[in-house]
């Protein structure tokens, strides 16, 4: 593990500003026109103003033309950590919540997507392994947009009923240690934004809000991101949102996972402090292996590769799932370190417990049909 020097920001093309300017005074409200002007002038929209603005956008109180202009303006001027935090707070307000009483070792495993790697659903496979090893998982996901197979697609292929109410998701977590929250069901207000995003056809702030807005409010998270600059940004957003233990990762081969094919950048929030470092497969006794063999064409192929990994079939799928599930176990505070987590993940796979966890979860979701 190599600690990174984060004092000097790197120059990047990603449309996000890493540091927010703190206001001396903030207005409670801001008009759409004022917000757009602020973006054009490359000035920050402060926290309370962003709360007001996002509530208007989510409730369709701003015209589609103006909403699109503001979303574009935010991207061009570069969104700040404060703006992202406020926007995520509003999305959480509008979400259909999942109540979970036992929150010990409770974690979300999620990625932003958009990395263009077209690999099988590594984080989805990892959640079964992590749950079998003692974590409780609240996974928040959707159908594939940039990927060949989103988490919802592969879960359906595996026989999971993804159309559960928040109450039913909570019951699944209590019964199996796993809950899957299908984004359209839990974020109904997004229907007002979806047509705007579709017509725009470019990345906006909403592309990075999904992983920040878990309806079960999991206090711990393993989050993969599509760009290296997002590592430091998202972990600091999680800090503002009150996360307990967060690991934000970016594989330097472009994966929004902990990678076997390259070093992985990590931003970790623990005990209220953030640190950034780099890890390598060799740190954990793993060989560096190209991720090319992990690519799939659709959910059917992703399902097959996921079952290989859970079935303890030797190969790259099993290795990368062990690596990511182990990291999730560390994020969930089940394991004392990533290395300890990998050991626990391997045991869960080799014993058959991970595959049994998948079968149990499928049965639990089917009871609600």
Curated annotation (Swiss-Prot):
GO biological process, any: L-tryptophan biosynthetic process
Residues involved in Mg(2+) 1 binding: 123, 257
List ligand-binding residues for 5-phospho-alpha-D-ribose 1-diphosphate.
111, 114-115, 119, 121-124, 139-147, 151
Cofactor notes: Binds 2 magnesium ions per monomer.
Please give the catalytic activity noted in the UniProt record.
N-(5-phospho-beta-D-ribosyl)anthranilate + diphosphate = 5-phospho-alpha-D-ribose 1-diphosphate + anthranilate
- Give the metabolic or biological pathway: Amino-acid biosynthesis; L-tryptophan biosynthesis; L-tryptophan from chorismate: step 2/5
Output the HAMAP family linked to this UniProt entry: TrpD
Q: Which InterPro entries match?
A: Anthranilate_Pribosyl_Tfrase (IPR005940), Glycosyl_Trfase_fam3 (IPR000312), Glycosyl_Trfase_fam3_N_dom (IPR017459), Glycosyl_Trfase_fam3_N_dom_sf (IPR036320), Nuc_phospho_transferase (IPR035902)
According to the lineage, what is the superkingdom?
Answer: Bacteria
Residues engaged in binding Mg(2+) 2: 256-257
Question: Which top class of enzyme applies to this chain?
Answer: transferase
**The protein's name:** Anthranilate phosphoribosyltransferase
Pfam families (UniProt xref): Glycos_trans_3N, Glycos_transf_3
Documented EC number(s): 2.4.2.18
Assembly and partners?
A: Homodimer.
| One GO CC term on file | cytosol
Residues that, per the record, bind anthranilate 2: 197
Per the entry, which co-factors are needed? Mg(2+)
């Amino acid at each position: 593990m190599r600690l990174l020097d984060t004092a000097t920001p790197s120059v990047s093309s990603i449309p996000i500003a890493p540091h927010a300017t703190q206001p001396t005074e903030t207005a409670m409200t801001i008009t759409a026109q004022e917000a757009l002007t602020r973006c054009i002038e490359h000035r920050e929209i402060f926290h309370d103003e962003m709360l007001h603005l996002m509530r208007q956008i989510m409730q369709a109180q701003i015209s589609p033309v103006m909403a699109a202009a503001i979303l574009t303006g935010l991207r061009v001027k570069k969104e700040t950590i404060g703006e992202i935090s406020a926007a995520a707070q509003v999305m959480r307000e509008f979400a259909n919540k999942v109540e979970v009483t036992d929150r010990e070792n409770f974690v979300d495993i999620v990625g932003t997507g958009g990395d263009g790697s077209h690999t099988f659903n590594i984080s989805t496979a990892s959640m079964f392994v992590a749950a079998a090893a003692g974590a409780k998982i609240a996974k928040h996901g959707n159908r594939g947009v940039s990927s060949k197979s989103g988490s919802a697609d592969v879960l359906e292929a595996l026989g999971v009923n993804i159309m559960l109410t928040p109450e039913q998701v909570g019951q699944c977590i209590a019964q199996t240690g796993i809950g899957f929250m299908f984004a359209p069901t839990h974020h109904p207000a997004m229907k007002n934004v979806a047509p705007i995003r579709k017509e725009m056809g470019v990345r906006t702030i909403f592309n990075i809000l999904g992983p920040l807005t878990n309806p079960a409010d999991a206090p711990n998270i393993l989050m993969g991101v599509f760009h290296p600059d997002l590592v430091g940004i998202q972990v600091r957003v999680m800090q503002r949102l009150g996360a307990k233990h967060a690991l934000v990762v970016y594989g330097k081969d472009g994966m929004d996972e902990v990678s076997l094919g390259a070093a992985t950048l990590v931003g970790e929030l623990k005990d209220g402090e953030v640190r950034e470092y780099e890890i390598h497969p060799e740190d954990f006794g793993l060989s560096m292996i190209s991720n090319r063999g992990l690519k799939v064409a659709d959910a059917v192929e992703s399902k097959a590769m996921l079952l290989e990994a859970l079935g303890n079939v030797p190969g790259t799928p099993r290795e990368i799932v062990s690596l990511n599930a182990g990291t999730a176990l560390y994020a969930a505070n089940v394991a004392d370190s990533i290395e300890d987590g990998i050991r626990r993940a391997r045991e869960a796979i080799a014993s058959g417990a991970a595959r049994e966890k998948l079968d149990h979860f499928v049965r639990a979701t089917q009871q609600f049909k």
